[in-house]
Regions:
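Glycine-rich dinucleotide-binding loop and its adjacent helix/turn
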Residues: 122-171, 176
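FAD-site-proximal beta/loop scaffold in flavoenzymes
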Residues: 129, 134-151, 246-250, 272-322, ...
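Phosphate-coordination loops involved in phosphoryl transfer and adenosine-cofactor binding
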Residues: 5-7, 82, 153-155, 221, ...
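A Rossmann-like FAD-binding core segment of flavoenzymes
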Residues: 69-105, 111, 177-301, 340-355
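A conserved FAD-binding loop/helix module that cradles the flavin
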Residues: 169, 316-355
């Protein structure tokens, strides 16, 4: 298995990670970005950028992200796409190495680094989980269709939730899934008419587009009861429909013991219910760094975590200010702090003449 040695390993290739890489590479620090999927993430799926200084609003988030990545690469950043990080060691006691004290593991290679940056962002779902939701998280349960949708090509999936996010994610899944069961526990027509959503026009356009998709089955006024599965992962979801059904074919068997309960045969469950929001992606951290009560990584003013030489930037910190410009700022601060840390400087160096 290949071993990559570097000064700075960055997990995540969003605006925070790319900005950090730009600065560390300009400081002549060997930098590697490990990116799970370059076309996912909050910025990548944004259709237009209207609030990033100096960027024309006709530019998409993905275009801006590619420019950030290319700029970092111009200064020497090594970019690894489709990187599935599943574990990390963050102290010299764990790595048994006095120089490369951080190790990141993927199925295809190992990265040894002198410093580590966590920039994996967040995905939407906080609040009380449904039975089986946490058990099958990462094994069929997901909060990010744009991250995991391609894994469910020609499969049956369920999307639960009546929010704008649920509608957009369900639309994305129609590109891959055989059938998308869209489950809402409310009357959608009443919800949109009442103006509960902030962007009524956009929501109704997306809603109409979703309902016109041939592979979408909408089950409204339907409750999600449980996610079920086996050792292989999710095999279905148990739902409860109103008398007469919820407006679509169930695709499963009715449970005679409990009238109105139906088991839908699905391989993926994308949940955007009550409490949908931002959940930092920290599953690979294995409790090796301190998190706050909401799951965000705790950092100091230099973006350093509870472990020396490990930094966290962007939405993984779970701040209220989830903006591209804020994520980029985090990346800049972390990079300058890393340069100071690795070179044992007393003061932060403002900029560098790149060699």
């Amino acid at each position: 298995m290949e071993v990559i040695e570097c000064d700075v390993a960055i997990i995540g290739g969003g605006p925070a990670g790319c900005t950090c890489a730009l600065y560390t590479s300009r400081a002549d620090l060997r930098t590697v970005i490990l990116d799970k999927n370059p076309t996912t993430g909050a910025l990548a799926i944004t259709s237009h950028i209207a609030n990033y200084p100096g960027v024309d609003r006709s530019m998409s988030g993905l275009e801006l992200l590619y420019q950030m990545k290319e700029q970092a690469q111009q200064y020497g950043t090594r970019y690894e796409s489709r990187a599935q990080v599943f574990m990390m060691d963050v102290t010299k006691e764990e790595t048994m190495d006095e120089v490369y004290t951080k190790t990141v593991y993927t199925p295809d290679y190992t990265v040894k680094a002198r410093s580590l940056v966590l920039a994996t962002g967040a995905m939407g779902r906080v609040g009380k989980p449904f039975p089986g939701e946490e058990e099958y998280l990462g094994r069929g349960v997901s909060y990010c269709a744009t991250c995991d949708g391609a894994f469910y090509r020609d499969s049956n999936v369920v999307v639960y939730g009546a929010s704008s996010e649920a509608i957009e994610e369900a639309l994305f899944l129609t590109k891959f899934a055989k059938v998308v069961y869209w489950i809402t526990n409310v009357d959608i027509s009443r919800q949109t008419e009442s103006g509960l959503e902030r962007n009524k026009v956009l929501d109704q356009e997306a809603l109409l587009q979703l309902l016109q998709c041939e592979n979408v089955k909408h089950l409204e006024k339907t409750r999600l009861l449980e996610v079920v599965g086996d050792v292989s992962g999710v095999t279905g979801v148990r739902i409860k429909q109103p008398p007469g059904g919820g407006g679509g074919s169930s695709g499963g068997d009715t449970d005679d013991a409990d009238e109105g309960e139906v088991l839908l045969d699905v391989e993926g469950a994308f949940i955007y219910g009550a409490g949908a929001g931002s959940k930092p992606i920290t599953d690979f951290c294995q409790s090796k760094i301190a998190l706050d009560e909401d799951g965000g990584v705790i950092v100091d003013a230099n973006m350093q975590t509870s472990v020396e030489g490990v930094y966290a930037i962007g939405d993984i910190r779970n701040t209220d200010y989830k903006q591209v410009v804020v994520a980029a700022s985090d990346g800049c601060i972390a990079a300058m702090s890393i340069e100071k840390f690795l070179n044992n400087r007393k003061m932060v160096k403002v900029d560098w003449i790149h060699k």
